[in-house]
Amino acid sequence: LTPIISVQFKPPPTRDFPVVVEKGFEKRAHYFRGFINSGHAQIQKGQTHHHGHMTFAWRQGLDTDTIRHRILNVHIGPCIYSVPPPLDRSHESPEEFFPPQNRNRGGGPKAQIQRHPPEALEKTTH
């Protein structure tokens, strides 16, 4: 099954738009592609888009509620819809977004988890 993230927009778009959802912590952002219809974006797992920032695939084990509350901006064509971030984001870290493989959070043994080289995770602050 492919999890889908739903994000509501005000005002809703009048037609289907390609969408890039930007979420992240500190200076790092993560992008997911999908299409918007009837004011909701449906972003499917694992579709990543390089948009001038370091980009990761959505790993297994992240529930939709957690991701939805971490979405920062949604790009629809030339427009950016802002989604309020959590009140306290100071505790967030790459490990929270991408837990180690040996931590079983569902998905089963056949889950495709994309590994990135260590250098991709080196810089977390300025």
From Swiss-Prot:
Disordered: region residues: 83-126
Biased composition (Basic and acidic residues): 116-126
Stated name of the protein: Uncharacterized 14.4 kDa protein
